[in-house]
Amino acid sequence: MHTQKGSLTMAVIIVSNCLLGCTCRYKGDDCRNEQILKLAENNTIIGVCPEQMGGLSTPRDPSEIVDDKVISSAGRDVTAEYMRGAETALFLAELNHADFAILKAKSPSCGKGLIYDGTFTGNKIPGDGVTVQLFKKHNIPVFTEDELDLLPL
């Protein structure tokens, strides 16, 4: 739901916290994106990290989707944590009437269209992360940091 700021119409955008500069990625780093940060000048940005919101620590073992489960490189099934984080992100998106989301590409949580194949070898396959799947089911448009030219602004 667009909001007003003076004469400007502002979009409400859910954004992966790592893209905003938060050190929440699995290895404890970020992937700050200045172009996304600039969107905060004229839009409402709501940061999320589904992995942390689901109860996972930072740093943490990398995880990949294997069949319908999310498995860490140590062999631990972390599907429940990923689902809990996705549901929390969805709650925030719906509560704030988000117009769309910008989520981290290739992540098992936030990846859209392309994710790692579950072998922990760096190979990628077509697919969506857990949060993206849930957002799509609830008709929340999702973009990655590689699709900023497609944003409906």
Model regions and ranges:
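Short, well-ordered beta-to-alpha junction loops that form the rim of enzyme active sites
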Residues: 18, 104-107, 147
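Short, surface-exposed acidic-centric catalytic microdomains
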Residues: 31-72
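Short amphipathic alpha-helices and their capping/turn segments at secondary-structure boundaries
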Residues: 2-4, 32-45, 85-100
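Internal, conserved structured core segments that host functional sites
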Residues: 104-115, 119
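Hydrophobic/aromatic beta-strand patches that form the interior of the parallel beta-sheet core
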Residues: 46-48, 102, 143
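Extreme N-terminal starter segment of soluble prokaryotic enzymes
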Residues: 9-14
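Short N-terminal binding/cap micro-motifs at the start of the first secondary-structure element
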Residues: 21-28
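Divalent-metal-activated hydrolytic enzyme cores
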Residues: 4-8, 23, 53, 63-88, ...
